[in-house]
């Protein structure tokens, strides 16, 4: 199964960030489907204000991915922040936030 970037529907397009997402991109155990996402993020983008009011003012979802280009700073509620850069695979557990240090492409 494959999909080209331009064929993934845009679900959010604001200055500094474009999010693309497609559901049903593979099956998970228990009958659930996986979604695939592609983010194009501009330097200086910080999602923390969008997360205010959520539990611990952070993202509650887990994320696995790969940084194609750029650099992100990940802040965790219960751990030191870390830098994720081009070529890195990542896992972000619940209760994190990100800000973009360098223009980034992330899947």
Placement of each model-derived feature along the sequence:
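Short histidine-centered beta-strand/loop micro-motifs
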Residues: 48-59, 76, 99
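Short acidic-glycine-tyrosine-enriched beta hairpin
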Residues: 76-96
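A short, N-terminal "cap"/entry segment at the start of jelly-roll beta-barrel domains
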Residues: 1-49, 55-56
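Short, conserved beta-strand element in jelly-roll/cupin
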Residues: 57-74
